[in-house]
């Protein structure tokens, strides 16, 4: 049975590589196309499975009854992800994302959510999915519909599980509207734009203080992109600088999916019994290694992460 269950989107990504982004009304040639599996839920599940091994990570989501779904299931199984928690619907197409990527690795994403919107709260109460949630020590929440998020967070806490949440676009709803979810979250993993949307604050400590009024035990983890990451909770503040890819002879190719690689590695490290700081350092390294790969789901294998582990950036810890 799995150590981690991930609840989130499964998409088919069409990556369009261009020299630069077009202006409105302008046509820009596409240099190459890469069609690859994606979706934040699936990406995080695969990232964790690559580090933990076969059958250690389950994905709970929804696909259409189409060719994309068949490809997705095969790919996920090949990656060692438990797919028994995936629902199929005939009322919507499988999710798809159309991603423009420029020469600097920056991206613009347009998404058809499709079947991802069909995972409902009542689906989580079926015995097949409840058995996955009961078996897991960590539940990672990503981007199902709001009602399903609330139900998932509640069930996870009911079972006494560690809950991690990448709030993503839900952060625009604000902390007050999301407080029923936040009360059940142990680790909130978001970026700078999302923390501002969620709390109205750009200062990480002030943002955590606002969140702690809802949940005193919450740990805020900020993904800072090319500046590394940081973590704040009741006990400590910690920051991890970026990995110097140039020193390793590596370069940025595609930043799409690096946050998913980060979260998957953090969850996997915690599931292995590692502490917050070591898990944060490993997650930071995994995210950095992902940007050197062109595919959305380019998270490192266990062997790759271990090979570069000695080059990981070390955390600076401030005890409060």
Residue ranges and their predicted role:
Residues 1-62, 67-74, 78, 249-252, ...:
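Glycine-rich phosphate/adenosyl-contacting loop at the front of the ribokinase-like
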Residues 137-210, 226-229, 234:
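Conserved beta-alpha-beta core of the PfkB/ribokinase-like small-molecule kinase fold
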Residues 75-91:
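A glycine-rich helix N-cap at a beta->alpha junction
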Residues 85-89, 99-138, 142-143:
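Conserved phosphate-binding/catalytic loop of the ribokinase/pfkB sugar-kinase fold
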Residues 9, 61-65, 88, 101-103, ...:
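Cofactor-binding loop segments of dinucleotide-utilizing enzymes, especially the Rossmann-like FAD-
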Residues 48, 191, 259-260:
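Short, conserved phosphate/pyrophosphate- and ester-handling motifs at nucleotide-, phospho-/glycolipid
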Residues 1-4, 204-320:
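Conserved phosphate-binding/catalytic region of the ribokinase-like
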